[in-house]
């Protein structure tokens, strides 16, 4: 009942601007464009500042290109073995040969097997199974006792 009253008050007090279900689509479609920028007398809007703005844009592009060059072209180091990988993958002469590497692969069989978590899981499964069996047995016992009392 309290929940119904809260919902009713919410619907009654909801306005179209705050939490209402009415959406004014025309308001969202309007574009606000400043058409009268010429009234501002600053260097941003003068023709004299066009060269300055072009120089700033050019400087930004050069800086972005420098960042891209640093990130992608100069990143390939000796440790990535990029050239070796390309030779192995794309050369026809190395199809019969295998590539040698000093990096050892991950071998799961040599990993140390830990038995303690398995012991804990088996004890937990055993206790859960025992609890379920005990609950079923206790439930049947109480049903049998109540049936005996009702027969007397």
Swiss-Prot record:
It is a single-pass type I membrane protein. Keywords: Cell membrane, Membrane, Transmembrane, Transmembrane helix, Virulence. This is ESAT-6 secretion machinery protein EssA. InterPro entries: EssA, EssA/YueC. Its main location: membrane. The keyword ATP-binding does not apply. It comes from Staphylococcus aureus (strain MRSA252). Residues 136-152 are extracellular. Signal peptide: none annotated. Component of the ESAT-6 secretion system (Ess). Required for the secretion of EsxA. This strain lacks esxB and esxC. It is found in: Cell membrane. Residues 1-114 are cytoplasmic. The chain crosses the membrane at residues 115-135. Belongs to the EssA family. One of its GO terms (cellular component) is plasma membrane.
């Amino acid at each position: 009942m309290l929940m119904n009253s809260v919902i009713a008050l919410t619907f009654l007090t909801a306005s179209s601007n705050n939490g209402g279900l009415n959406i004014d689509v025309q308001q969202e479609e309007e574009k606000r464009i400043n058409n009268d920028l010429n009234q501002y007398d600053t260097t941003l809007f003068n023709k004299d500042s066009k060269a300055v703005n072009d120089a700033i844009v050019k400087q930004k592009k050069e800086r972005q290109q420098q960042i891209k060059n640093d990130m992608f072209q100069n990143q390939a180091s000796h440790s990535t073995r990029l050239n070796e990988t390309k030779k192995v993958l794309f050369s026809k002469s190395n199809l019969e040969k295998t590539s040698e590497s000093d990096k050892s692969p991950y071998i799961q069989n040599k990993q140390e097997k830990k038995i303690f978590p398995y012991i804990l899981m088996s004890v937990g499964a055993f206790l859960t199974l025992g609890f379920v069996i005990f609950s079923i047995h206790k439930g049947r016992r109480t049903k049998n006792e109540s049936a005996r009392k009702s027969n007397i």
